[in-house]
Amino acid sequence: MGWNGGLTSPSMEEHFYPFLIERRPSYMEEDEEEHEDEDLSLVLEKKDKDLLLAAELGKALLERNDQLMKAKDALEEELRETLETIEQEKHDMRLKMEVQESEWRAQVADLESDLAEARLQMQQLLSEQRECGRESASAAQELSEQNQRLVEQLAQASQVEQALNMELKSLREENRDLTISRGQFAPCLQSLRSENVLLLENKKEMESQTKQLQDENDNVQNQLISAKEGIFHLQRQKKDAELQVQQLQLEAQKLRDSQRTLQLQVKELQEELHMRDSQFSTHFSLHSEIQQSTAGQDHEMTTEAFPGLPCLPPSPYNLQKMGRNSVETQSITSDYMDTYLTEREGDLLRDSEEETIRLQDKVTMQHVELTTLQEEVQRLQDLLQQNNLDSIAKQAVLDRDEALMKKGELEQELARCQMEKESLNLQLLSTIQQKVMLSQELEAWQDDMQIVINQQLQSQKQQETQKVPETPQNSFMRRDSKQGRIFSFFKNI
């Protein structure tokens, strides 16, 4: 700044001398006139006037300069006061800024901790949201698959319905034909009904007869089993009897063999006796002893071969031969031996004949029983065949009843298919309702999450406003910074 406060001099400005500008053409004219007329007096007068005007102008300029100086001093004083006020306000603002900066740092630390917690909560919420999204996606996938299955089932049900409708149409046509033919064949139907009643009565009678025949068949089966057991027992007895006959035959053969052996021995003894006939009187005792020893040997051999036979005396036949050839003086003894031999042989023959007759009678009885049992078995077989014929007739009646029941069964099947179709439709509707409910729940969950986030942000804002009373400018700056942080946080997420 200069002496005049930085203001330019008024002498250098043309707008402070308007009269000079206005009179400049006149000066030029006067100069021309001076050159032309060379009127010096006029020039002098004009110069005097100019001097007067310059003096007046200088005086005005001095007054104007004084006013400007006063204005300058006032402005400098005002500027000084303003600068002092500004410096004081600047110092106060610096102190406030330091206090607010410390508060802001504390708030920033709190906000960072809150932001970390909010990030953790947001991560948890996002993980839960992803989990819910996966669950909702899986549920939607399951619902879509179930919907697809239901659509396929519905298509199948529609196909079945079409088939059943066609079948129902054919059945209705058949029913119509039957109703038409029923009017034509009403007498036949009445007769068939009467025949059916008779057949039902016969059926009941046949069922009762069948039941009786079954009972009889059971009894006959039991009798047949007992008869088979009796046949087996008789066959076993027959085998035992045959074995006994074979044993008796063997015993008889052994007796014949022993008899031949004894005959040979007797023959040898007879030869010896013929040779010693002359010495019979002297050796009679010896001959008797030999006979006794021979009879004892024969008896011992017979006992050893057949222990079951009764004890018999020495063979009368041998004694007879021996007595005939050796002792003529002992006629009484030989007669006694002949009588004993005859009686003994007769007893043996009678016993063998009785045993043979008994066995023959037993075999005959067994044969008769076997024949009776065979006849009974044949009768039972005939009865079973007759029962088979009755069962065939019964089966025919049952087939007719089954054919009559088919129509009702088909109608029941059609009604069941209709019910299944209705149930499938209801299931489809319930599935669609569940899908809509799940979508509504998902939207409600998203809205709840948004509300929770907004509530947390509002609570943080309320805490900040309660902690620090702020000016509008600072609150606006903080709001902008906070919104910038929130937006940057969501961008980072």
Curated annotation (Swiss-Prot):
Keywords: Coiled coil. GO terms for cellular component: cytoplasm. The keyword ATP-binding does not apply. Residues 56-275, 365-431 form a coiled coil. InterPro entries: Spindly/BICDR_Dynein_Adapter. GO terms for biological process: Golgi to secretory granule transport; vesicle transport along microtubule. Belongs to the BICDR family. This is BICD family-like cargo adapter 2. It comes from Xenopus laevis (African clawed frog).
